[in-house]
Swiss-Prot record:
Disulfide bonds join C44-C59, C49-C78, C57-C74, C60-C67. The gene is ESFL11. Expressed in stems. It comes from Arabidopsis thaliana. Keywords: Disulfide bond, Signal. Belongs to the MEG family. This is EMBRYO SURROUNDING FACTOR 1-like protein 11. Residues 1-23 form the signal peptide.
Length: 88
């Protein structure tokens, strides 16, 4: 048979393990949310211009093509021509 002091120690350990497990679950959720990395993928790629031998144009990746020497202009037009799909 278990003595009362052994039973008390067992109960303290059991309660401590439950509290530790609850803490780890909360900590794990925080770490999961903090580890979500957002990667920006430009809608434009560098390509060779039709009028040049160098890769100095930026063209849309999507269905509708547009090329520009300026990356900002390309991104703006590509997002207008090929809007990103909504996330599920």
């Amino acid at each position: 048979m278990i003595s009362s002091s052994h039973f008390a120690i067992f109960c303290i350990i059991l309660v401590s393990l439950f509290a530790l497990q609850q803490y780890e679950i909360g900590n794990m959720e925080e770490n999961l949310n903090a580890s979500k990395i957002v990667v920006y993928l430009s809608p434009c790629v560098r390509k060779r211009c039709s009028f040049s031998l160098f890769k100095n144009c930026h063209c849309c990746r999507g269905k509708y093509h547009f090329c520009s020497k300026n990356i900002k202009v390309c991104e703006k037009e590509c997002l207008r021509l090929n809007p990103p799909r909504p996330l599920p």
